[in-house]
């Protein structure tokens, strides 16, 4: 007899974006949804009265431990921000810092209804420990940089990434999977990119990388290889169906065609792109071409939070601003990118509420002035709701937040430890 959980008394957001009153019944042993609508009682009940039950949000590009650097350096272009502030600070990270930063970020995401994410960083075992403790779903990888390193260090970094991808591809009973994660097309040499591709195809895991984030990133690739970044990526073997890239801000029509033909996905990070003045990704054009587009926060150092509700609102607004068309990236498209689009990009069977899907749910409390009246639930998700409106968060059938109390962690202790470590890190880095 399976152990069941019923999310009862709310309205349910269906895959076709219709909304109806009903319950969601979850098999906690399997971590799956087993009934929607009129359901039998469960062994345990989560009260969703006055709420909308929606798929858990997917943060498809993140550097979760960078919460320690939230507010550390602002109001700079990407290259200066990285070279003058972030990379020197990261060089001073001590043992345990990344675990502490990751735990803080996981608490923040659970609070905001995120149930799955992709994370590119280093000291991945520390991040995996924190994710395992949190109960979230994730695809993880070691972010490799080989350019500017001597051969021995470059080889070691590359080997670390390959090892991490092998070790964590089915961790935490399958909730945690891996990807090969070369940082970008300009920070990883061509021979290492080709090695990544060969290893990824042999292991049947995707590749995740930054691409076309800034104009400054595009120029050296054109100069060195005589091709656009995604043309170069395709030439070295990237852009397979399961691969996913972050940003894609300066992606041309020809590159969009390459993406559509390949089946590779793009993770749009609107807040980070605005804050670093990187530009606006051509999301409407990508979607019209059939490219899967997901949403990501990027790291908290360049955002400066991990609230995917902010991203879906920004995505909808920027789509209109960029095209001059008010119907570009409509509310439904933005919510889809934050749920089913993210799940598709990361290869998870979540992002929708239907029988057989992963039981990853966010219960959004609509009993608030800014969510009243309710003419259209989806409109409110895109244009009015924030992560603070989430009342319960459920991942893999387990309740991670009930009535706004995060259950896997002592939240006060997590915040205190992260604040202390961030202060010590800043002192070492000479802030």
Curated annotation (Swiss-Prot):
Substrate binds at residues 90, 183, 213, 298. Binds 1 zinc ion per subunit. Its cofactor is Zn(2+). It holds the Pfam family Amidohydro_1. One of its GO terms (molecular function) is 5'-methylthioadenosine deaminase activity. Its EC number is 3.5.4.28, 3.5.4.31. It comes from the Archaea. Keywords: Hydrolase, Metal-binding, Zinc. CDD domains: ATZ_TRZ_like. It catalyses: S-adenosyl-L-homocysteine + H2O + H(+) = S-inosyl-L-homocysteine + NH4(+); S-methyl-5'-thioadenosine + H2O + H(+) = S-methyl-5'-thioinosine + NH4(+). HAMAP family: MTA_SAH_deamin (MF_01281). Catalyzes the deamination of 5-methylthioadenosine and S-adenosyl-L-homocysteine into 5-methylthioinosine and S-inosyl-L-homocysteine, respectively. Is also able to deaminate adenosine. This is 5-methylthioadenosine/S-adenosylhomocysteine deaminase. It comes from Halobacterium salinarum (strain ATCC 700922 / JCM 11081 / NRC-1) (Halobacterium halobium). The lineage of its organism: Archaea, Methanobacteriati, Methanobacteriota, Stenosarchaea group, Halobacteria.
């Amino acid at each position: 007899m399976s152990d069941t959980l019923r999310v009862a008394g709310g309205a349910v957001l269906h895959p076709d974006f219709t909304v109806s009153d009903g319950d969601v019944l979850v098999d906690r042993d399997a971590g799956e949804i087993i009934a929607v609508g009129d359901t039998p009682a469960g062994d345990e009940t989560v009260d969703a009265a006055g709420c909308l039950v929606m798929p858990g949000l997917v943060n498809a590009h993140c550097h979760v431990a960078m919460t320690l650097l939230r507010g550390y350096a602002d109001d700079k272009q990407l290259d200066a921000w990285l070279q003058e502030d972030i990379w020197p600070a990261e060089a001073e990270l001590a043992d345990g810092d990344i675990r502490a930063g990751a735990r803080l970020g996981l608490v923040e995401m659970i609070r905001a209804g995120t149930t799955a994410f992709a994370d590119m960083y280093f000291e991945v075992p520390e991040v995996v420990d924190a994710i395992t403790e949190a109960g979230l779903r994730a695809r993880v990888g070691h972010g490799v940089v080989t350019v500017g390193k001597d051969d021995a260090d470059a080889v070691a970094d590359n080997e670390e990434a390959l090892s991490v991808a092998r070790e964590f591809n089915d961790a935490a009973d399958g909730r945690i999977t891996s990807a090969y994660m070369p940082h970008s097309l300009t920070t990883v040499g061509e021979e290492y990119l080709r090695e990544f591709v060969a290893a990824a195809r042999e292991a049947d895991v995707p590749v995740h990388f930054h691409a076309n984030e800034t104009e400054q990133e595009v120029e050296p690739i054109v100069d060195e290889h005589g091709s656009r970044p995604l043309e170069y990526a395709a030439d070295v073997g990237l852009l397979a169906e399961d691969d996913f890239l972050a940003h894609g801000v300066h992606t041309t029509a020809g590159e969009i065609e390459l993406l559509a033909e390949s089946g590779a996905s793009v993770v749009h990070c609107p807040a980070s792109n605005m804050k670093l003045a990187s530009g606006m990704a051509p999301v409407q054009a990508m979607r019209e071409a059939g490219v899967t587009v997901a949403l990501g926060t990027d790291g908290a150092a360049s955002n400066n939070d991990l609230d995917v509700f902010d991203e879906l609102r920004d995505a909808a607004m920027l789509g209109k601003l960029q095209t001059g068309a008010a119907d570009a990236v409509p509310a439904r498209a933005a919510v889809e990118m934050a749920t089913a689009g993210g799940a598709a990009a990361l290869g998870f069977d979540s992002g929708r509420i239907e029988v057989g899907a992963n039981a990853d749910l966010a219960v959004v409390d609509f009993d608030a002035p800014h969510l009243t009246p309710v003419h259209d639930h989806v409109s409110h998700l895109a244009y009015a709701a924030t992560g603070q409106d989430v009342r319960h968060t459920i991942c893999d059938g387990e309740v991670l937040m009930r009535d706004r109390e995060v259950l896997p962690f002592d939240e006060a202790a997590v915040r205190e430890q992260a604040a202390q470590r961030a202060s010590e890190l800043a002192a070492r880095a000479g802030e």
